[in-house]
Regions:
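Alpha/beta-hydrolase-fold enzymes
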Residues: 76-187
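Conserved alpha/beta-hydrolase
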Residues: 17-20, 28-52
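Catalytic nucleophile-loop/oxyanion-hole region of alpha/beta-hydrolase
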Residues: 44-82
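Catalytic histidine neighborhood in serine/cysteine hydrolases
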Residues: 235-252
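Short beta-strand element of the alpha/beta-hydrolase
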Residues: 6-14
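Catalytic active-site module of serine/aspartate enzymes centered on a nucleophile-bearing elbow/loop
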Residues: 247, 251-300
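Short beta-strand/loop motif that positions the catalytic acidic residue
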Residues: 209, 215-217
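Short beta-strand-to-loop junctions in surface cap/lid or active-site-entrance loops
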Residues: 1-5
Length: 300
């Protein structure tokens, strides 16, 4: 990061992702080409190192995101900020935008491949080819919680470790709803999976978002249901819904000049939208920066 006055983008990965995920790194490279800086948030346990508490990240964990945004806003005071979230990170992003105090310099956000209605999306993963994704994600989640159990034991936090062991033993889990009901809900203060879905689905909060925000969805996303493509009347005037006929889940791959070098629609669309929302003062600073030094002092 160089204090150039250019925007800084905070990026939140999806379920089973991390700051090293291809879609995160790809966006960071695209932003760097524009002279923008970026920060990638790693949610609890995302790097493979379990955190010290009997909790993880979920659609309603926007308190963690709020802490990161506050830290970034304080560390880079006055710098224009924007926010991008993918999949579950997109759900966290939208819930954060709707329910939390926002930094004064946050000017725009984007959420991609978002399960806006958690209940129907959980059931969607029990159908057809989507079950392949469900098995992969549930296997990763079980491994993450098992690592957490070992970490808690190593710290002498036996009560927490044993509680999680007891919940995991209720498996095997053959659906997200069963896993969320047995593990996620009780460990994060929800009465049940239904309670978690009802309280943390971003769909109910969209009308409360006032920061300019684009939601990018693909019509062929195997994770999403019709409820994830809301009518314009349910959106606030600050929300924009961009639906692509193809793109899958966080994929959005387009043919490149060579078949081994595909291009990614999101690496073009996200910076394009964020750039369209940049404050005029930042645009002026960027223009001045591109001028020869002799002209910069007179125009800055």
């Amino acid at each position: 990061w160089k204090d150039s006055g250019m925007p800084l983008v905070v990026i939140v990965h999806g379920l089973s992702g991390c700051s090293s995920s291809q879609y995160v790194v790809g966006l960071q490279k695209a932003l760097e080409l524009r002279g923008w800086a970026s920060v990638a948030m790693n949610c609890r346990g995302a790097t493979g190192e379990a955190n010290d508490l009997p909790r993880a990240y979920h659609a309603g964990a926007h308190d963690d995101l709020a802490q990161v945004m506050t830290l970034v806003a304080e560390r880079y005071a006055g710098v224009p900020l924007s926010l991008v979230g993918y999949s579950l990170g997109g759900a966290m992003t939208l819930n954060y935008l709707a329910t939390m105090p926002l930094p004064a310099h946050l000017f725009a956000a984007t959420a991609v491949s978002v399960p806006l209605d958690l209940a129907s999306c959980a059931d969607r993963l029990d159908q057809g080819l989507s079950q392949i994704y469900r098995k992969h994600l549930l296997d990763n989640l079980m491994k993450a919680w098992q690592r957490k159990v070992l970490k808690l034991h190593s710290l002498g936090l036996e009560a927490d470790a044993e509680r999680i062991e007891h919940l995991l033993a209720l498996g095997p889990f053959n659906s997200f709803r069963a896993f969320d009901d047995a593990v996620v809900a009780p460990l994060h203060g929800f009465h049940s999976a239904e309670d978690y879905y009802a309280r943390c689905s971003p769909l109910q909060n969209l009308a409360r978002i006032h920061c300019p925000t684009m939601i990018i969805q693909a019509a062929d996303d195997p994770f999403l249901t019709p409820k994830c493509f809301p009518e314009a009347s349910t959106l606030s005037s600050s929300l924009y819904l961009d639906v692509s006929p193809q793109g899958g889940h966080v994929g959005f791959v387009a043919a490149g000049e060579h078949w081994r070098e595909p291009t990614y629609f999101l690496e073009q669309r996200i910076p394009q939208f964020l750039d369209s929302q940049v404050p005029e003062s930042v645009r002026r600073a960027e223009m001045v920066k591109r001028l020869p030094p002799a002209y910069q002092s007179s125009l800055a």
